[in-house]
Structure formats: C-alpha cells, structure tokens
Amino acid sequence: MRFYNTLSKHIEEFKENEPGIVRMYVCGPTVYGLIHIGNARPMVVFDALRRYLEYRGYRVIMVQNFTDIDDKIINKSIEFSVDFKDISETFIAEYWRDSMALGVRAPNFSPKTSDFVPEIINAIQNLIAKNHAYVVDGDVYFSVRSFPRYGELSHRSIDELKAGARIDLNEKKRDPLDFALWKSAKPGEPYWKSPWGNGRPGWHIECSVMSTKLLGTTLDIHAGGEDLIFPHHENEKAQSEALTGKTFVKYWLHNGMIKYTGDKMSKSTGNIFLLREALKKYGADALKIFFLSKHYRSPIEFSEKALSSAAKAATRINETFLRFESEFSFAIPKQDSWINEKRSIFIDSLDDDFNTPRALALIFELVNSLNRAMDDGNERDALKIYHLLRREFCPVLGLFDLPERADNRSIEELVKILIDVRAELRAKKQYELSDMIRSKLRKVGIELKDMPQGTTYTFIKEV
C-alpha cells in the first residue's frame, strides 16, 4: 500500500507504527454554519480510506475534531446575542445530520476544543519552558525560529514564507511568522483562566493537543484539505515536535479543493453550495461518485452537469442491484480465480495512492457485466458479480450501503402494492385514480414505467 506523502513529496510504502493499528486524524470543521460540498469531499474521501484500511485488515482509530472556539463563532454569537456554545452546538448537531444523510461513518472520537482547554494550557506551559514560546501582554506566541525544521511540510524556507504567506502582522510578535498559542480575552468574548490571564486557545494548538492526547505522540496518518498545509498543518507539526521531540505524523495526506466558478469553495467568501441542498437534489451516492471519480489529490470543478452525470450513474447501479435482488437468490458464491482476479485489480487500484477513479471504473465495468449476465440468464456469473459489488467493493467506498438498502425494503414492498392497486384501477378504466397514484409517487421520488410485460419503477432524485 502506497500513499503520496506531502512531507516528502513522494509516494511511499505505508508502514504503520504499531502492527495492525492505524492512528488517523482528520481536521474537522469550524462550526459556525452549515457545511458545503467542499467540506464534504474530505469527509467522503477519508471515510472511504478508513473503510479500505479496515477491508485490508487494519484496526483504524480515527479522530476528527470540531473547532468550537474561533473568531467566526464568537462574531456570530455577538451578532445574534447568544452564547458561543449555542452557535457551536447548533452547527455540530447540523453537521451530524448532514453526515448521516451523506452516509459517512462517525469517527471513533470527535473532540471539541472547549473540552481540552486544561490540556492546551499545559502544552503551552511546556512550550514556554522549552523556549519555543513567549508571553506578551497576556498573549502567548510560538517562536518559529526556535524550530529549525519550520517550513518542511510546505517545502518553503522561512524567508519564502515571510514573503508570500498569509501571516498575521502584529507588533507584539518577535517575528511576523510567529503564531498565537493563546489569545488574551477581549471585552464580550468567552474566556478561560490561565497563568497568563483570561483568554482562549489559538487555532493550531488545539489539533496538536487533541490528536496526541487521543492517538499518542506519533500519528500514522494526518489528513485534510490542501488549503490547510500552510499555515495550519505546518504550525501543528512545529509545535507538536517542539513539544515532544518526536515525529508528529508519518504520512500527511491532503485532498484537492472543489472549485466553484473558478475559485475555492469557501464559507468565508459565500462561494458555496450547501451539502444538504446537493443531497436533496442528487442523493448521497451521486455525490460520492462525483467525489471519488477524481483522484483525491486533484482539484474538482463543481458543475451541475457533472453531478447530474453522477446521479444517472448512481441510478443505473441501483436499478441493476434491484433487478438482481428481484430475480436471483442471495447465496454466497464459491471463491474462484475470476473473483480473485477482480479483487486483486480492486486492491491494486486502491493500494496505489488510493486511486478511487480506477476502482470506480472497475465497479462500472462489473455493473455492465452483471446486466449482461442477467440478460443471458447466467445466474452463476450474476451471483459472483453481485457479491463482489454489493458485499465488497461498494461498501469499501461507502457506496449503496447495505443498512440504507435494508431500510428501503419496506418502501419497495409498499410500491409493489400500489402498482397492483393501480393495475386493478386501470383494468376497471379508472384512469384518473391510476394517474393520481403515478403523480403522487413521482412527487416523492418514485417513477412508474408502464411496459408491455408490466409496470416497473425507479427511484429518482430530482422531483
């Protein structure tokens, strides 16, 4: 198994720290609004990576944080005259709602910054004691020049970073690149007591503390969007390694951005398409196909055309599964060389820097083969293909999850009853009632098709 490591800028063989266990940290959202499809890409990609690691036999311990102390959250709480926790807790709940609708599994741990303030204060005290941080008027800053390897992750020297990076110009700091570990409280802001006075944690220190407290000193994988490489991940790496003297992360994985009208999709600019709107219009599987059809490190240009195409592909696959389930049995096929060959192709694809486009291409190829096998009445081959798709390949990528399909069985039985009722109405020439049933079903996303051999149905997304 090989991954492109942002730190080395090379594809490297994956070797976990502790045999059989992968410790994985993914940067989560700052919770001050509803998430958009740009936020959803790392959710889908790294959920699929976690599933694949488990498929390959690893035990994965995954942590994804919530940043619930931040200027944007505080500003919104002031705007609406509510406590900052009312804002953060509201949007954490909305995040879980969207995450469940998308079919992304919850991480093992979902820490919030506000729950780790004592540990953050302790870490800052240790950095001060090691001469990596200094106090100015109640603020605490990390001294970038105290850490010679600063810039390793973003592959830029300190002078290059000073010339072109987004840095906070502040007269209190000894160096413009130095960053805040602790911010002194301003009037009306939430605060915590500390040795340096009332204040709150800076952005970067929270991830270092939460990740190492929950996963240990050295993480196997740290993942997030490429926009976090600098300054966030660079700063995380510096302060963590300055604190422990050990390697913070073995493999840094970063996904490409989603472009919307040519620019990065971002809440702060308003250049967004909300995830729940996309889910309502296209469905979870269409969005996952859209994300996974591009290599995770490549940018994706958002377009209605691309999402519509992904929705059609999802419908086609779903209809194929429905057809098999209505015509054939669910026996477990015997393993043979053909199954092992396809499984090897799937594994080789994802072992190669998690190449989901190649894995998806195999899934699409097998869906076509499954339809041909059913057309030919070849139950043996159909069963083998269905098993690989339904029980192995699709679940690994989080597609067409079985729990969701199991919940749909009662819906499918009800639709069949309505089709029978409608057939009786048509036989009695009660066409107005028959058409009403068709119309009502279409409004809830079910389209009936009257064929010479009888009525069939499909699930549609845009109604």
Swiss-Prot record:
Name the Gene Ontology biological process terms.
Answer: cysteinyl-tRNA aminoacylation
Catalytic class of the enzyme: ligase
> Catalyses which reaction?
tRNA(Cys) + L-cysteine + ATP = L-cysteinyl-tRNA(Cys) + AMP + diphosphate
Q: What cofactor does its activity depend on? A: Zn(2+)
Is the keyword Metal-binding assigned to this protein? Answer: yes
Place the motif 'KMSKS' region on the sequence: 264-268
Work out whether the entry's keyword set contains Isomerase: no
Name it: Cysteine--tRNA ligase
